[in-house]
């Protein structure tokens, strides 16, 4: 063999079998950034049709988690596939940089604003902290192979973006969508000010626990809603009973709240003071025990939904309140009926908003009831608790009263109990100027993927309250408005003033608003107006990025976003805040398509949790397996539902990766010595099987590109695996090894094969590029021929071709041949087990086939043996089958396996009768002699 080894076309490549991705990828990244890969893509795509995927900004705090990786990798796959489809698809990553979590982290380091540091210094520290967090996350995303404007991302704290956020507020105000209203906030009566969530501590407190009767305003109407089980209506007053530990809020009560699906019971108490009481059926016994009522029975039942809008008498004021429905009502404790004071609770406020309840706030900033508060004027709320209880007793409204110890919010400064108190807040109104209706209409013009996203966001928009956009925080974009001190009206020149403030912020950042003297902007009007010192909800910051970023960045050339892609929780979040703000500003949706992915869970479907110990960190995966494995995991999942990840699942991704890598390596190794400039074989001169293989690649490419266009990465990876493992690995590559290794070097038989391999790998590397970006780049650099520096700057390979119309050896033919080959292989395997033969090349097979099948198989002539990987193969009529012939799974086909005649050729390992008969080449067969010394064998079919 050694004397003929140099005559073989042995595979040779610098592309290693082992990916060693964890070590190799960082080196590739260095090259990408040194040679400005992203800049090269932008240059190559300049002037092409635009595709804009707008990045929803992650929060600039903490390390990235596996959900971040899933999201960013999906975006990167889509961007890269669009680039290969000929689009100019820039990617500008973003970060959400204002808000409470950053404030909390900074407070730990420098204390609260106004203590050791001024508010201005505190904001600067927040800016520094957020900038550091962005840099950390940025490096993590880059390690995943995400390409984008990393040197010029958008950050909501960039001066230009902050200025544009303020401009967005001005536009919304100018369109009539801004509204000033009231909303309950944490309020310290000792500070006389609102508290942020961070300024609230929880400690145990003893409060009065009371069950209070609200009498039915119309007993007959109320009874008609119950299904009476006793055959009579009972006797005594009818009351619905609420439970509360804040009696002082009862003057502000404006409703009783039930849950629609809870069952409520009408109870008849027995004895001298018989009455009828309504509570949740599940809690009835607890309520009766608490009230010391031993003798009672049930009169009837009704669902909460049936009792909606029933009217009840306020326990001590002369007005009625409705029964309303809310999801926050539970049966954990109480009566299943919640006292609702929209001015004194966030849930009360939210549910009250849906029913347009009055937001009554009878309490001043010092915690004292206002002078016009009937019965309790001038009393401090906590001292008034006893007074409220006494009034309830006098009115006969108190069912039960006892002391109750519970966890209660306290001021972090004064260590005293706080209250919820409605204070003026700014809202984007959903109905004042028709915003809700326009938003609902615009939803129909957006493509929602999955489709259920449409009904989900429609339901949310239909039912949502006004959007409260104001916050009493330090680190945030200011609500840069001036309001009249007496009328509370906005300044008539608000839009012009907004632009002036925006220009200041562009130059100096948000601190400019707190620094600027009102007289600088308002002149003589300054004394009549006051600055709004609230900041904007961070959802406003990110929600208006369609304007502050997409409209503003030159990379987008004035194009609006084609696609928003985030987790399914963003129907409630970013998708919604973006939609509302865009409709408010532009009367159109900010996106054409919205695609959502599910949450990442472990292999058992559980959420990621440090306590369970099932957290998979992206950094751990890239350090161990490499980013391409993580990217392949993302692409291989059906991300529309929950996405499972575990060590076992990642191992499966690594196995799939190895199969794809080995396929690519086979292509590259067998293209050794091939120059596309000089060695390409014309289509009509190619071996039939090679033409078929290129045609299969074309069919695969059409399906893969379509799957990419539909954002179906799961479909891409499935088709890619099928092509590599089945069409190539199990058939084509297996068959061509003999020809590729043993054919005359540079002859048509070898070059035809290499031409096919070259065309296919040109396509394959592009299919891989959006998903396995590092590996695709590695393959690209090992491929023969002149080419661009990077695979990512090009487009899908257009050199593939299908089989010509009328081709005799068509796709159907090769499908049948593969079936025949499979049937023969089974019998060869049996013969191996029985030791009739060693390997397939020690066998010769005789196929006894019916006329139709024989006619097809015979089209391969003497090359049938190369397809079957045997040393000899004959086809005979079915009627001549021998006793040794065995049936196969194919009707009309029997096969006889026998040991091949002749000696083994030292070069190709085939057993043929002519080995040892050729002078000068006694150890090799005639075919090999031709390939070594002659013109080379001729192959037409395989």
From Swiss-Prot:
Q: What residues bind ATP, as annotated?
A: 610
Binding-site list for Zn(2+): 905, 908, 925, 928
CDD domains noted in UniProt: Anticodon_Ia_Ile_BEm, IleRS_core
Q: Alphabetically list the UniProt keywords.
A: Aminoacyl-tRNA synthetase, ATP-binding, Cytoplasm, Ligase, Metal-binding, Nucleotide-binding, Protein biosynthesis, Zinc
Name the domain of life this protein comes from. Bacteria
Q: Some GO term, biological process aspect, for this entry: which one?
A: isoleucyl-tRNA aminoacylation
Cofactor stoichiometry and binding? Binds 1 zinc ion per subunit.
Q: What is this protein called?
A: Isoleucine--tRNA ligase
- State the species of origin: Vibrio campbellii (strain ATCC BAA-1116)
Lineage, uppermost ranks: Bacteria, Pseudomonadati, Pseudomonadota, Gammaproteobacteria, Vibrionales
């Amino acid at each position: 063999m050694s004397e003929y080894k140099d005559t073989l076309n042995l595979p040779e490549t610098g592309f290693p079998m082992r990916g060693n991705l964890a070590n190799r990828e960082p080196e590739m990244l260095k090259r990408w950034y040194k040679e400005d890969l992203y800049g090269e893509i932008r240059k190559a795509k300049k002037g092409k049709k635009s595709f804009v995927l707008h990045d929803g900004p992650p929060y600039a705090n903490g390390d990235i988690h596996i959900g971040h990786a899933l999201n960013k990798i999906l975006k990167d796959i889509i961007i890269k596939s669009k680039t290969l489809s000929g689009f100019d698809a820039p990617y500008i990553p973003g970060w959400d940089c204002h808000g409470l979590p950053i404030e909390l982290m900074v407070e730990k380091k420098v204390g609260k604003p106004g203590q050791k540091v001024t508010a201005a210094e505190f904001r600067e520290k927040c800016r520094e902290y957020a900038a550091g967090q962005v840099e950390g996350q940025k490096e993590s995303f880059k390690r995943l192979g995400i390409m984008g404007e990393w040197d010029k991302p958008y950050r909501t704290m960039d001066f230009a973006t902050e200025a544009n956020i303020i401009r967005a507020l001005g536009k919304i105000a100018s369109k009539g969508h801004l509204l000033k209203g009231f909303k309950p906030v944490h309020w310290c009566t000792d500070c006389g000010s609102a508290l942020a969530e961070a300024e609230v501590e929880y400690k145990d407190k003893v409060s009065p626990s009371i069950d209070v009767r609200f009498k039915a305003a119309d007993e007959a109407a109320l009874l008609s809603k119950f299904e009476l089980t006793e055959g009579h209506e009972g006797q005594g007053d009818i009351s619905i009973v609420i439970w509360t530990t804040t009696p002082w809020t009862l003057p502000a009560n404006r409703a009783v709240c039930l849950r629609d699906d809870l069952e409520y019971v009408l109870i008849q108490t027995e004895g001298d003071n018989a009455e009828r009481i309504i509570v949740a059926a599940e809690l009835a016994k607890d309520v009766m025990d608490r009230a010391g009522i031993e003798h009672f029975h049930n009169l009837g039942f009704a669902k909460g939904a049936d009792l909606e809008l029933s009217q009840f008498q306020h326990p001590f004021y002369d007005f009625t309140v409705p029964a309303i429905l809310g999801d926050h009502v539970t049966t954990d404790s109480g009566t299943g009926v919640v006292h609702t004071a929209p001015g004194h609770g966030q849930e009360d406020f939210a549910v009250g908003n849906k029913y347009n309840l009055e937001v009554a706030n009878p309490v001043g900033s010092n915690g004292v009831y206002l002078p016009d508060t009937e019965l309790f004027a001038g009393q401090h709320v906590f001292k008034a608790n006893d007074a409220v209880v006494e009034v309830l007793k006098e009115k006969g409204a108190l069912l039960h009263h006892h002391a109750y110890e519970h966890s209660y919010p306290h001021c972090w400064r004064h260590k005293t109990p706080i209250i919820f108190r409605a204070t003026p807040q700014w809202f984007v109104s959903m109905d004042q100027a028709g915003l809700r209706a326009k938003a609902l209409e615009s939803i129909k013009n957006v493509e929602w993927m999955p489709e259920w996203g449409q009904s989900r966001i429609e339901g949310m928009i239909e039912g949502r309250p006004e959007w409260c956009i104001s916050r009493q925080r330090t680190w945030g974009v200011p609500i840069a408005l001036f309001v009249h001190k007496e009328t509370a009206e906005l300044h008539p020149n608000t839009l012009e003033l907004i632009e002036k403030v925006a220009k200041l912020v562009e130059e100096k950042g948000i601190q400019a608003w707190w620094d600027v003297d009102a007289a600088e902007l308002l002149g003589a009007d300054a004394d009549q107006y006051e600055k709004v010192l609230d900041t904007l909800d961070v959802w406003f910051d990110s929600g208006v990025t369609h304007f502050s970023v997409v409209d503003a960045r030159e990379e987008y050339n004035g194009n609006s976003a084609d696609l928003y892609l985030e987790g399914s929780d963003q129907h409630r979040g970013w998708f919604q805040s973006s939609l509302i703000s865009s409709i408010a500003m532009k009367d159109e949706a900010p996106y054409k398509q919205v695609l959502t992915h599910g949450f990442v869970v472990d292999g058992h479907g559980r959420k990621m949790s440090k306590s369970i110990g099932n957290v998979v960190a992206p950094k751990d995966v890239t350090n161990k397996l490499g980013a391409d494995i993580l990217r392949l995991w993302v692409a291989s999942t059906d991300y529309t539902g929950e996405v499972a990840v575990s060590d076992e699942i990642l191992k499966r991704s690594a196995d799939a990766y190895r199969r794809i890598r080995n396929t690519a390596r086979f292509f590259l190794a067998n293209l050794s010595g091939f120059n596309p400039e000089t060695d390409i074989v014309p289509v009509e001169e190619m071996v039939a099987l090679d033409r078929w293989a290129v045609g299969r690649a074309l069919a695969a490419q059409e399906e893969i590109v379509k799957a990419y266009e539909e954002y179906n990465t799961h479909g891409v990876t499935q088709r890619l695996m099928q092509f590599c493992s089945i069409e190539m690995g199990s058939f084509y590559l297996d068959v061509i090894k003999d020809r590729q290794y043993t054919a005359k070097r540079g002859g048509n038989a070898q070059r035809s094969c290499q031409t096919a391999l070259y065309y296919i790998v040109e396509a394959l590397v592009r299919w891989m590029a959006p998903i396995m970006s590092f590996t695709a780049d590695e393959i690209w650099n090992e491929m023969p021929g002149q080419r661009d520096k990077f695979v990512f700057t090009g487009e899908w390979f257009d050199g593939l071709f299908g089989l010509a119309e009328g081709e005799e050896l068509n796709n159907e033919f090769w499908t049948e041949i593969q079936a025949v080959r499979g049937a023969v292989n089974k019998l060869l395997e049996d013969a191996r087990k029985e030791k009739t033969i060693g390997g397939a090349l020690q066998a010769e097979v005789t196929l006894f086939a019916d006329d139709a099948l024989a006619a097809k198989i015979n089209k391969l002539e003497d090359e049938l043996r190369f397809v079957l990987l045997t040393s000899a193969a004959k086809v005979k009529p079915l009627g001549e089958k021998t006793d040794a012939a065995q049936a196969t799974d194919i009707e009309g086909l029997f096969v006889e396996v026998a040991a091949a005649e002749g000696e083994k050729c030292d070069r190709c390992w085939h057993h043929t009768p002519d080995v040892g008969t050729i002078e000068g080449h006694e150890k090799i067969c005639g075919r090999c002699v031709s390939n070594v010394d002659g013109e080379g064998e001729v192959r037409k079919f395989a």
